[in-house]
Amino acid sequence: MSIQSGEILETVKMVADQNFDVRTITIGIDLHDCISSDINVLNQNIYNKITTVGKDLVTTAKYLSAKYGVPIVNQRISVTPIAQIAAATHADSYVSVAQTLDKAAKAIGVSFIGGFSALVQKGMSPSDEVLIRSIPEAMKTTDIVCSSINIGSTRAGINMDAVKLAGETVKRTAEITPEGFGCAKIVVFCNAVEDNPFMAGAFHGSGEADAVINVGVSGPGVVKAALENSDATTLTEVAEVVKKTAFKITRVGELIGREASKMLNIPFGILDLSLAPTPAVGDSVARILEEMGLSVCGTHGTTAALALLNDAVKKGGMMASSAVGGLSGAFIPVSEDEGMIAAAEAGVLTLDKLEAMTAVCSVGLDMIAVPGDTPAHTISGIIADEAAIGMINSKTTAVRIIPVTGKTVGDSVEFGGLLGYAPVMPVKEGSCEVFVNRGGRIPAPVQSMKN
């Protein structure tokens, strides 16, 4: 395939002017060989394995970034869900395991480590429950550990006992961490994927290799610039522009991933195509939708525009890589997207509209600040609604919601860095407490019967 000089200049502009970057190189590490009935031995085994497998990740990323001139923003680690790994200890708390993950991740210099997780879509083992109840204290006493809970799937339905506990866990975490910041490191999933490189929801699935490299790219600014500079008039033409741009973005990510795999001698897993925004101007998914013809993100037509964007990104990315996986779509995290923040502050982008948008994109209600007095059962209800969308549509959905203690609608909260800031958004006045407290399981839908 011949490369034109114009295409080379396009790639240079992507990095220099349009905020293109490789968002993360994530090493997934299997911890099954660390299992011990003694929690102290387990912690030592975990520390040793992470610091051995991941020791060269940061230096490799810096080398590749310099070699190719492409920023590689984060280096991360994901591990096997700790509820599985710590079960043999029969401990009544896994906070020490979270602290070990934190210590190991800091020792090798990575940005985040994910996998303080439990998969409870069909039921909770004693270990799962211990882990979930350990999350608030774990988030309070660690800095870069991320946690996730998978409470439902298309095949299993929704575990409402776990949904209730997840809502209480988020609420408790908000109460004991400054401005609820610990909740920014907790994701509650339906249909969680095993090869996600993005935080806070990354964990290393049990069906994965001993270690694997997963890469996430980010290029909302590139897509917006491509639309600004194109002569596309119809939405068919808009989709074509997005598709071609996604192809170019993906090729860069594929190159970085394969090179990292070779240098680290770890198999290349997947490339996640997700358009991941940042709070920086010019790096917003919302502004892409507005470029398509919306006056403000969140107005009528937003869900349709997002569906077009998400599908075109996937089509372009799939052509560029044979290893597409993870979440692969367009993220809509309110606090991490300058355009979403503006739309929410204007009162146009609401929680209800965001929920509708999650039906057509990845991944879910993300980085949304709500009043600090929001009850736990309301958080559980929001989680259940989002899980239902994922369950029925056979897609990954998730909730990362932050009840901000002492704040109410009209206030805003600053998280800093890539997490940005967010206006506090209202939740519904009515109560779902009786519904949530019923417990049990919402049965798997008829779509689950595929054999």
Curated annotation (Swiss-Prot):
SUPFAM superfamilies: PFL-like glycyl radical enzymes
Gene3D superfamilies: 3.20.70.20
Domain of life of the native organism: Bacteria
Transmembrane segments: none
Pfam families referenced in this protein's UniProt entry, alphabetically: DUF711
Alphabetical list of HAMAP family matching this protein: UPF0210
Subunit composition and interactions: Homodimer.
Assigned protein family: Belongs to the UPF0210 family.
Protein name: UPF0210 protein NMB1652
